[in-house]
Curated annotation (Swiss-Prot):
Ranges where the Protein kinase domain occurs: 1476-1744
InterPro entries according to UniProt: Kinase-like_dom_sf (IPR011009), Prot_kinase_dom (IPR000719), Protein_kinase_ATP_BS (IPR017441), Ser-Thr/Tyr_kinase_cat_dom (IPR001245), Ser/Thr_kinase_AS (IPR008271)
The protein's name: Probable serine/threonine-protein kinase DDB_G0282963
Low complexity bias locations: 19-47, 60-85, 92-105, 112-237, 257-269, 322-341, 348-451, 546-572, 591-627, 674-697, 759-778, 805-824, 847-885, 902-956, 979-990, 1081-1149, 1180-1262, 1288-1303, 1320-1338, 1359-1386, 1393-1454
EC number: 2.7.11.1
UniProt GO BP: positive regulation of signal transduction; signal transduction
Record organism: Dictyostelium discoideum
Catalytic activity of the protein: L-seryl-[protein] + ATP = O-phospho-L-seryl-[protein] + ADP + H(+); L-threonyl-[protein] + ATP = O-phospho-L-threonyl-[protein] + ADP + H(+)
Active-site residue numbers: D1597
Keywords on record: ATP-binding, Kinase, Nucleotide-binding, Serine/threonine-protein kinase, Transferase
Bias kind Acidic residues: ranges: 633-643
UniProt feature, compositional bias: Polar residues: 238-256, 573-582
Length: 1761
């Protein structure tokens, strides 16, 4: 194997990993060749398909290129086009039996690694590809194409404008081309920069342009839309499948003499690398980097935005020639890059050019992207390797769209928001250069003349060493990437260059050399300090001198600001390993043309990613550049002036730094000579001094001494660079874990002494005299927003947030702000554990420490509120609003923000690790995924001793040695070892490692349960936060978690005597007990104190109940007052203690022990202490007032209105009823039950009056009033008695009230205010109240008043409650407080009842019913609610859940905070199978069978679910008996209950005559007109009872087969399997259900179901009945239509052609008109069910008035037949 190693190769040891398979080189080459062959075949097919399109594009582009080439050829050195790149070689990578990786730096003796890989050198274009990257097919006309690549890559207005200043004649043509052919230019640029977009993996396409500059694009196989052909290069880029690499590295090398580089590995992704080279540099020595560390770490830690140090590469210093063509080095994983220079010109070398959004978004792993254009200026360094690249890709595309509109550039380089260096020119008229610059952390503002000495920009002078850091930037903020689901698409290993100045710096405390013989050859004899300083001043100190910027060309600066705002999202390298970022200092050796020069002061990057962070820094402005003096020498380390300036500068990053800090060299600030900027914009002139640094995140560290900076270099080049301190010092101040070298988090520098905005940066910041009159910095300066400090921070931090004033791009700014929050998720200490909200259902963070309101974060994003550390404690003592929190608590720079409650963490403030990444908290809110910084360098060991005998080589060898030992654990986010921190932090860190425990939590009375993953640190608050939805921020949760032993129901049947003396039980303690027969939760009921006794006939029981009501009212008043004092929890507990009593007569497990858990209790800890079985039950907290009252009512108001509140509360409770009838199981069939229910309500009413008058002791009056109203209600409710339903001994997991069937007694009901439906076919006004009959004078059609005839409606006592609840719902709507809760809980209101009286026609949609004297009470409650400013509603919330022992319970509606998806199931009456006796089978359906049976002596029908039923059918079956348990109407099928034993069975009313379809099909059956009108009315009335529920219930399957006829020939609506509430109707619910002939035509168009769809179906049913009675035979709909052969044609033809069933000839005109109105094509033109009922009543009146006319129609028809 050694014989095959070419000379000059670098052998890198590669440790074998047990989980990684080592593939020999030959085998791998064979596999690659096979893949390449397949890919070549695919290429050929793709080429044939693309040839025609490519030819057309090539022709057009070549013409443009020829024109552009003439201009470029004249500009670039006159005759540089003939230069060729030599010594182009493919790096030969071999895997020596899994032991080492060999990188061949010299031409290999054999062909390239991949047979299809080739290096085609044609003139100036060199394409180097490896694997299947075959872009070299058609490299013709390379000279011209390369020049045009450079031209077209920056063929934007900016570069062309800059060329206008230099080359007037040529640039005019270029401008024309740019303006007229932007799309073409953009396509050209896309083609130039197009990478072979891979379906799988990475490919690198190196297109050298303009002699020796190179354009390297790397796609990670993400974007499949970037398959643009390199038409300019005549390269037909094919989408190929890349070779599969295991442990070996895919290295692409193009040296010119010798080169050096670094490598990294990945087990998921082939790591590609170009080794940089210079003409005069020697081969670099790569220290032994343990690739196994990479693999192991990638496997374990690269799961989120994590990073770790891979190793160190030592650069070999060399002398620099005057014209050295240093190529740029770009890798997917490892980079050490510099710029490419050519004499007199700065060449665009690398990257995704301006006009390829997709490529730019995907090329986030490029270290440098330099885009050069005609103007010989560096337009863009687009560097990535940053963690949150994907987070902002979409928004960046939007930003580019804004640029497209204003700058005529379809695609700008703004996509690479995570770019590391941004070199740009400010010469564009449309400020495109600023757009490009604002994308990047630092820009090299190059001269328009572009003259840059190669010695100033040489890769070898970058530094002595480079730290390679691995990071994963492919975790999208909107994605749900879990801890075990890493995405390696953007896995990068970035290079951080280290610089050293003298040997003393090598004697740092944290390292000692144990291997002095390592790297002996790496002496620094060739280090050229003078040349390094030239490079330092030019490359590191970002200074732009643009002499050609035109003032009039900044018209779009405000739009650019928006772009800048958007682009600054990822400028922090949030989620990236910090590559080399340098300070804006030093004077570049560029030609300085002082013509309106704009000094783009790219200051330290903004870690918190404020929208305008780089607006303030890199825009065209009159900034005085902070540069260092030209006479800086390598030996001098002056400390003068800079300390004072730092101290006085409010922008400095060292507010609290000591004066005499030795850790950094500070040179005096000098203003740039080119500060004159005549370019102003009136939109931005108001942006003053603070703009440059407003958005910079400042970390104010205190108590920092010289020891805290032991981990930093001090260099005469004034570039302070973090040392890779792998061993943490005890104070943890300067360890590498706080450096973004290994920490991806944007706030990872929180413990760093250096500015957070520049992780590897000298601490000098902008000059205090910086003024930004920049026309591109359209920003407003906001106050510094406090960050809720991690407890590890000893001093305050505040970041300045500048909001964007640009109104044109608000949406983009909002999106970017969201991305800012995403980026700020990483603003954590390096020791923060990763918390995945999506993955872990139980987060370990207390809810009080988390702002769980997503909407708040989104709103704050509009204001650029990236203060992710703001908390809203759910504790009432910390109930400040989020926005108020940000605006009110604005501490001074040295004043810490408001203290966080101590329960956040037990870690003291002095601890260096935080309990939680506050940015992770916010990311939970905003994006449902958390990306936290990697916990790094929390080492247990102390720093090694200082050794004075070691040289620089020892530093790097020690780093590698220490890295091998510690990287696998130190930089794994799941393993944190920090002995210096408190144990609480270590516990938090170890929570991810502990085995999760799963518990079951039951809701209420056990109706539902869910499995929850908890850990030892999971608190009750965490569980509540997962199951609650709070409408008001900071609202205390209204649920309590109880620990109990059993969910069994009470089996005691207490007698009335027992009940009479039983005290009332507070709902707060027993409202959620699992009592099916005694405690019934009706969560929709807003009634507060309405409780029903079984037989409250004695005075004692009444007095007891009254006293209970008084106590509750008093408590409510206290709660109302205490809401403003934020003491709800205490008062609620008091109420619970006062009323929490159980019936002593009950001997069952109702008295089982239970414990209410506090929010701070640890779930598992409490469970361990519990004796016996432990069951967690969530119960509603009855006494908590509405959350909205806290913010809307004042304590004085509450105090003044207490009495009125008491009165109003009970009025409301009296008038509001439950969703369904509530009665004791022992009195289901008793007449006394409903009377008792109503009497108690009235008794409460009188009691409230007594409370209002303060006559609490007048029990006799109470009794008197009670009996009075008792008898009064008996009279009104005589027809409302409930038929008995026998008891079931089986307990139900779903508690339900006893459901009653309607009685046979009827009462009158009037529809006085419903608009009448004009049945005259000549009258088009449906709502004409002056309707008259113009068809026949003999008919004597009654007028509107006469049509208000009686409609038989069966009455139920439960309907009285329903109406009252609707009234109360209206009250809440007026008060704007509890609308959501009431509406949610009123979903299943029963609509109609007796004696409906409506106040206005607006009540057509639903009919509220009131019962007798209860109606005025409802009106009183309305007025009281309005007058008391929402206090009544709040008190109602407290009183909603009073219970009586062993009777029924009504749950608070407004206090219920369940999520909609987790609402408790409705009541279902469970029947024991032993009570059912099957008789015979009477029918069968698709998934059920119907039997005739006997239940409790009554004939019933049992619907049995078939065994082969699918899960969907089972759900429909369950839904049907759910709905049947909700509704109760005389025209709906009566529901007795369900049986769940063995098979699911429903017990319903037995209908002897079968369905309407069946009875109409009998030809011998005589159907008369009275029976027709009866069936019509009953069918419509049954559907109307569904539609008038709240929310309305849509049947969705109305047809004659689902309308049943009982023995009395009454019609019953049945089959509710497809019924669904209208509020749950979505686009997916618009799927056509039911029989096609009955489906409304709008359903075919995808419109959701509504009540009008049921009306259409009713119209078809009315037609069927009418046709049957007139013709005497049944006819199916569309039976006579010969064009219809299939059912699905009916829906299509009815929707598209408007066909309808044929109307019989003898149909009465009014009836015909009614039917046609029901099936109208327009749903809005169809009448409501109430209108149809009135119309049918009118028709029946017509029949009664002249029956012979209707009968003659039948007789005439019989004669005709």
């Amino acid at each position: 194997m050694k014989d095959n190693i070419p000379t000059g190769s670098i052998i890198i040891p590669l440790n074998h990993h047990p989980q990684q398979q080592q593939i020999p080189q030959q085998q791998e080459q064979q596999q690659q060749q096979q893949q390449q062959q397949q890919q070549q075949q695919q290429q050929q097919q793709q080429q044939q398909q693309q040839q025609q399109q490519q030819q057309q594009q090539q022709q057009q582009q070549q013409q443009e290129q020829q024109n552009n080439n003439n201009n470029i050829n004249d500009n670039i050195n006159g005759n540089n086009n003939s230069n060729e790149i030599k010594n182009t070689k493919d790096a030969n990578i071999t895997n020596n039996n899994g032991t080492s990786i060999i990188i061949s730096l010299s031409p290999p003796p054999s062909p390239a690694l991949n047979s299809s890989s080739s290096s085609t050198i044609n003139s100036n274009n060199t394409t180097i590809s490896g694997g299947d990257n075959e872009n070299n097919n058609n490299n013709t006309n390379n000279t011209n194409n390369n020049i045009n690549n450079s031209n077209n890559s920056n063929n934007n207005n900016s570069n062309n404008n800059s060329n206008n200043n230099n080359n007037n004649n040529n640039n005019n043509n270029n401008n024309n081309n740019n303006n007229n052919n932007n799309n073409n230019n953009n396509n050209n640029n896309n083609n130039n920069n197009n990478n072979n977009t891979n379906e799988e993996g990475n490919k690198t396409n190196i297109n050298t342009t303009n002699n020796n500059s190179q354009n390297i694009n790397i796609n990670n196989g993400i974007n499949k839309n970037t398959r643009n052909n390199n038409n300019n290069n005549n390269n037909n880029n094919k989408q190929m499948t890349p070779p599969t690499f295991k442990n070996n590295l895919q290295v692409k090398h193009q040296p010119q003499s010798s080169s050096g580089g670094s490598i990294g590995g990945s087990n998921k992704l082939s790591l590609s690398k170009r080794v940089k080279s210079t003409t005069s540099s020697r081969a670099s020595i790569i220290d032994s980097i343990d690739i196994d560390i990479v693999f192991n770490s990638l496997k374990n830690s690269i799961t989120s935005k994590n990073s770790f140090v891979l190793g160190v590469h030592r650069h070999r210093m060399s002398s620099i020639s005057s014209i050295s063509n240093t190529t740029n080095e770009t890798t997917t994983t490892t980079t050490t890059t510099t710029n490419t220079t050519i004499e007199d010109h700065q060449i665009g070398s690398i990257g995704n050019n301006n006009n390829n959004n997709n490529n730019n978004n995907n090329n986030n792993n490029n270290y440098f992207n330099v885009n050069n254009g005609n103007s010989n200026n560096i337009n863009n360094y687009n560097n990535s390797g940053n963690g949150n690249n994907n987070n902002n890709n979409n928004n960046n595309n939007n930003n580019n769209n804004n640029n497209n509109n204003n700058n005529n550039n379809n695609n700008n380089n703004n996509n690479n928001n995570n770019n590391h260096f941004n070199s740009y020119s400010n010469n564009n008229n449309n400020s495109n250069s600023n757009n490009n610059s604002n994308n990047n952390l630092h820009g090299l503002n190059n001269n328009n003349n572009g003259v840059m000495e190669s010695s100033d920009f040489n890769s070898d002078t970058v530094g002595r060493g480079s730290i390679f850091t691995v990071s994963n930037s492919d975790v999208n903020s909107d994605s749900n990437v879990g801890l075990n689901q890493p995405s390696f698409n953007d896995l990068t290993i970035t290079c951080d260059t280290l610089t050293e100045t003298d040997e003393e710096d090598l004697m740092e405390k944290f390292l000692e050399d144990s291997d002095p013989d390592i790297d002996e050859e790496d002496d620094d004899d060739d280090f050229n300090e003078e040349e390094f300083m030239k490079f330092q001043t030019q490359f590191l100190h970002n200074k732009s001198q643009n002499s050609s910027l035109n003032i009039n060309n900044n018209n779009n600066s405000s739009n650019n600001n928006n772009i800048n705002n958007n682009n600054n999202n990822n400028n922090i390298m949030a989620g990236s390993t910090s590559s080399v970022i340098y300070k804006n200092s030093g004077k570049p050796p560029l030609n300085e043309n002082n013509n309106n020069n704009i000094n783009n002061d790219n200051t330290v990057c903004n870690i918190n990613n404020n929208n305008n962070s780089n607006n303030n820094k890199s825009n065209n402005s009159n900034n005085s550049n902070n540069s260092f003096k030209d006479d800086i020498s390598s030996d001098e380390e002056p400390e003068t002036d800079s300390d004072t300036e730092f101290k006085n500068n409010h922008h400095t990053n060292y507010h609290n730094s000591p004066k005499n800090q030795k850790h950094v060299d500070r040179k005096p600030f000098v203003n740039s000579k080119n500060n004159t900027n005549t370019n102003t914009n009136t939109h931005n002139t108001y942006n003053n001094n603070k703009n440059n640094n407003n958005n910079n995140t400042f970390e104010q560290q205190s108590n920092e001494d010289e020891e805290s900076y032991s981990g930093s270099y001090k260099s005469s080049q004034n570039s302070v660079i973090y040392k890779p301190n792998l061993v943490s010092s005890p104070n943890f101040k300067s360890s590498l874990s706080s450096s973004s070298l290994i920490s991806v988090g944007t706030n990872s520098l929180k413990n760093s002494p250096f500015p957070p905005s520049s992780p590897i940066l000298s601490p000098q910041t902008d000059d205090p005299n910086n003024n930004n009159n920049n026309n591109n910095s359209n920003t407003t300066i906001s106050q510094p927003l406090p960050i809720a400090l991690n407890v590890s921070i000893e001093s305050p931090r505040a970041f300045y947030n500048s909001g964007s004033n640009n109104n044109n791009n608000n949406n983009n700014n909002n999106n970017n702000n969201n991305n800012n929050n995403n980026n700020n998720t990483n603003s954590t200490s390096a020791t923060t554990p990763i918390i995945q909200a999506q993955t872990h259902p139980t987060t370990q963070i207390p809810t009080s420490d988390i702002d769980t309101s997503n909407s708040d974060n989104n709103n704050n994003n509009n204001n650029n509120n990236t203060s992710d550390n703001n908390f809203n404690d759910y504790n009432n003592d910390y109930n400040n609003d989020y926005n108020n929190y940000e605006t009110e608590f604005l501490p001074p720079k040295k004043t810490p923000p408001p203290p966080i409650p101590t329960k956040m963490s037990s870690t003291p403030p002095s601890s260096t690790s935080s309990f939680l990444s506050t940015s992770s908290v916010t990311s939970v809110n905003s994006n449902n995924s958390v990306t936290s910084s990697t916990s790094t360098n929390t080492s247990n060991s102390s720093s090694p001793k200082h050794s004075s005998s070691q040289k620089s080589k020892s530093v790097f060898s020690k780093i590698i040695k220490e890295g091998k030992k510690r990287l696998a654990t130190k930089f794994n986010s799941h393993h944190h070892h920090n002995s210096g921190n408190n144990s609480s932090n270590s516990n938090n860190n170890n929570n991810d490692d502990e085995v999760p425990t799963y518990i079951h939590i039951y809701r209420g009375n056990g109706d539902e349960s869910w499995r929850v993953k908890v850990t030892s640190s999971t608190t009750v608050r965490d569980l509540l936060s997962m199951s609650l939805t709070s409408t008001v921020k900071g609202e205390p949760p209204s649920l309590k978690l109880y620990l109990t032993s059993s969910l069994n129901s009470c089996t005691c049947v207490s007698s009335p005597n027992n009940l009479s003396s039983a005290p009332a039980v507070s709902s707060s303690s027993s409202s959620s007990t699992t009592l099916e027969t005694t405690t019934i939760i009706t969560s929709a009921s807003p009634s507060s104190s309405s409780s029903s006794f079984t037989s409250p006939t004695t005075t004692n029981s009444l007095n007891s109940h009254l006293n209970h009501s008084n106590n509750i009212n008093n408590n409510n008043n206290n709660n109302t007052n205490n809401n403003n004092n934020n003491n709800n929890n205490n008062n609620n507990n008091n109420n619970n203690n006062n009323t929490d009593r159980t019936n002593s007569n009950c001997t069952c497990n109702v008295n089982k022990p239970e414990k209410e858990l506090n929010e701070d209790d640890k779930v598992l800890s409490v469970q361990k202490k519990w004796s016996g079985p432990s069951i967690f039950v969530l119960k509603n907290n009855c006494t908590k007032s509405s959350s909205s009252s806290t913010s809307s009512s004042s304590s004085s108001n509450n105090t003044n209105n207490n009495n009125n509140n008491n009165n109003t509360i009970n009025n409301n409770s009296n008038n509001t009823g439950t969703r369904y009838s509530v009665s004791s199981i022992t009195s289901e069939s008793s007449e006394q039950s409903s009377n008792s229910h109503n009497s108690l309500n009235n008794n409460n009413h009188n009691n409230n009056n007594n409370n209002h008058s303060h006559n609490h002791n007048n029990s006799n009056n109470n009794n008197h009033h009670h009996h009075h109203h008792h008898h009064h209600n008996n009279n009104n409710n005589q027809n409302g008695q409930q038929e008995g339903v026998a008891d079931s001994s089986s307990s139900s997991p779903w508690s339900s009230p006893a459901l009653s069937s309607p009685s046979k007694q009827h009462s009158l009901q009037y529809f006085e205010n419903i608009p009448t439906l004009a049945l005259d076919s000549t009258n088009n006004n449906n709502n004409n109240n002056n309707d008259t009959d113009s068809t026949s004078s003999n008919m004597g059609t009654p007028t509107t008043s006469r049509r208000i005839t009686t409609i038989f409606q069966k009455q139920h006592s439960r309907n009285n409650s329903s109406n009252n609840q609707n009234n109360n719902n209206i009250n809440n709507n007026n008060n704007n407080n509890n609308n959501n809760n009431n509406n949610n809980n009123n979903e299943h209101l029963t609509p109609l009842s007796n004696s409906t009286s409506l106040s206005s026609a607006s009540s057509i949609s639903f009919l509220n019913s009131s019962n007798g004297n209860n109606s005025p009470n409802s009106n009183n409650s309305n007025s009281n609610n309005n007058n008391n400013n929402n206090n009544n509603n709040n008190n109602n919330n407290n009183n909603k859940k009073t219970t009586t022992t062993t009777t029924t319970t009504t749950m608070n509606s407004n206090g219920e905070c369940w999520k909609n998806a987790e609402r408790p199931r409705t009541g279902v009456r469970w029947i024991s199978s032993t009570d059912l006796f099957l008789i015979k089978k009477i029918g069968a359906g698709s998934f059920s069978k119907v039997y005739k049976a006997k239940y409790m002596g009554e004939i019933v029908a049992i619907k049995v679910l078939k065994g082969e039923a699918t899960s969907e059918q089972i759900e429909l079956f369950k839904k049907e008996y759910d709905i049947l348990s909700l509704v109760s109407s005389q025209n709906l099928i009566k529901f007795y209950g369900a049986c769940k034993e063995k098979k699911l069975r429903m017990v319903t009313e037995y209908c002897q005559h079968g369905s309407l379809y069946h009875i109409m099909s009998k030809r011998k059956m005589d159907i008369s007109w009275p029976l027709v009108f009866k069936w019509m009315h009953q069918a419509v009335d049954g559907i109307n009872s569904l539609h008038t529920m709240r929310p309305a219930l849509v049947h969705r399957d109305i047809k004659s087969q689902n309308l049943l006829i009982n023995s009395q020939f009454d019609l019953k609506v049945a089959d509710f399997g497809l019924a669904k509430p209208t509020e749950l109707q979505t686009g997916s619910n618009s799927t056509i259900k039911g029989t096609m002939a009955y489906c409304a035509p709008e359903l075919y168009n995808g419109i959701s179901y509504s009540e009008k769809a049921d009306v259409y179906s009713l119209g078809i049913v009315l037609w069927e009945i009418t046709t049957r009675v007139i013709t005497g035979k049944y006819q199916r709909p569309y039976e006579d239509n010969t064009e219809i052969s299939f059912d699905f044609q009916i829906v299509i033809m009815s929707s598209k052609q408007g066909i309808r069933p044929t109307m019989p000839p003898n149909v009465p005109p009014k009836l015909s008109y009614l039917i046609q109105k029901c099936w109208n094509q327009d749903p809005n033109e169809r009448p409501s069910c109430q209108q149809i009922l009135l119309a049918i009543t009118s028709l029946y009146d017509d029949y009664i008035y002249n029956p012979s006319r209707y009968n003659d129609l039948i007789l005439n028809n019989d004669l005709n037949n």
